[in-house]
Amino acid sequence: MEKQIHGGNIYDKEVSLDFSVNINPLGMPDGVQDAILNNMSGYETYPDIRYTALREAVAGKERVQADRILCGNGASELIMAVVRAEKPYKCAVAAPSFSGYERAVSAYGAETEYYKLDEKNGFGYADACSQLKDMDIQMCFICNPNNPTGNLIPEDILVNILDICRDRNIVVVADECFLRFNPQYEIISCKRFLDDYDNLVIINAFTKFYAMAGIRLGYMMSAN
């Protein structure tokens, strides 16, 4: 069976409308376009290797400490970086979900074990916790809202997953790249759990909500 790759590969096909990556149809904000055009001379120099100003700006937007933020070239690179840093030998991934998790896991020689979402109930997470309890894993990926199903993880199940993984020293990687489309982002984001779960890593990006796919900019948040 042919493995699917990340969407957006429109260059060897005649594509007029690309539905593979779900980017904001409103397009890139005018302020971003203006900032790029008005700072062209800045591209002649290397960026700050610590991304100090960027991390502080993200910290202000997310209302978290700057030292809890790490920036990278999009969410996909950061997913790879987490797996590379933690070196798990088996990771849990929802099915169905974003294929990039399995790709990152495989790239570093680890194994993927799937916890299956309930297709009969809109691909819900009702059985996720019981499945995770029986898995011998070191890392668990959750996508909230899930891609491609679009459903949010209910609050009680989300907390249960975090508790299960914390008690078993399992790193939780929470992908929230689509969550900012939800008006309640500030209330439902996992960042509110950073003080309570030192095993939690949250990944976000400017790609989807801000329609900045070509700029390749993402960030992760973690307690440590």
Feature names for model-found ranges:
Residues 51-91:
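Phosphate-binding glycine-rich loop
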Residues 1-45, 170:
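N-terminal "arm"/small-domain region of PLP-dependent enzymes with the aminotransferase-like
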Residues 123-136, 148-168, 172, 176-210:
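Active-site pre-lysine segment of PLP-dependent enzymes
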Residues 22-24, 75-76, 98, 144-148, ...:
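Short glycine-rich anion-binding loops that position phosphate/pyrophosphate groups of nucleotides
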Residues 69, 91, 112, 172, ...:
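Hydrophobic/aromatic residues located in beta-strands of well-ordered beta-sheets
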Residues 50, 63, 114, 195-224:
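Conserved core segment of the aminotransferase class I/II
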Residues 85-142:
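PLP-dependent aminotransferase-like
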